Curated annotation (Swiss-Prot):
UniProt keyword terms in alphabetical order: Chaperone, Cytoplasm, Stress response
Cysteine pairs bridged by disulfides in the record: none
Protein name: Protein GrpE
Cellular component annotations (GO), alphabetically ordered: cytoplasm
Native species: Bacillus anthracis
Principal localisation: cytoplasm
One function term, GO molecular function aspect: adenyl-nucleotide exchange factor activity
Region feature (Disordered): 1-31
Bias kind Basic and acidic residues: ranges: 1-16
Subunit structure: Homodimer.
Amino acid sequence: MEERNEQVVEEVKEAQVEEAVTPENSEETVEEKSEAALLQEKVDELQAKLTETEGRTLRLQADFENYKRRVQMDKQAAEKYRAQSLVSDILPALDNFERAMQVEATDEQTKSLLQGMEMVHRQLLEALNKEGVEVIEAVGKQFDPNEHQAIMQVEDSEFESNAVVEEFQKGYKLKDRVIRPSMVKVNQ
């Protein structure tokens, strides 16, 4: 029986060798291999295009999200600072109002007029405060180049170094944005 098994094994080996050597099988195998290689190349190419398209899509999504965020921030800033133009136009009139109120009243009529001006001034400031306008505090404070504009320097032992000694023109802020810096004299 062992001889029979050995004989069958040898026949199978010979048949395999003959099949491998026949020209028809070798052509089919080469064609199959080249067709498989072409298909693999197509798969690789399509995979690369898919990866590129996915990356482009993700970048476009991120760009769009950034755009939406910028538009939202711009919209909020426009809403927050909508009164800036109006306030900038009103400030010179407010300065003139304050200068007019510094006049000394000598008679009753002038005193009455000044009281009326003070009431109008107070109402104007209240309306500006409702919109978020604040006066920038200056005298006695440390000089801050973001809020103060130094137009003079002086040496005064009564004040700390770099402190605001005198204010020549009031400064104003709208919420957290400086509309006009205070014009001040600074101690060295």
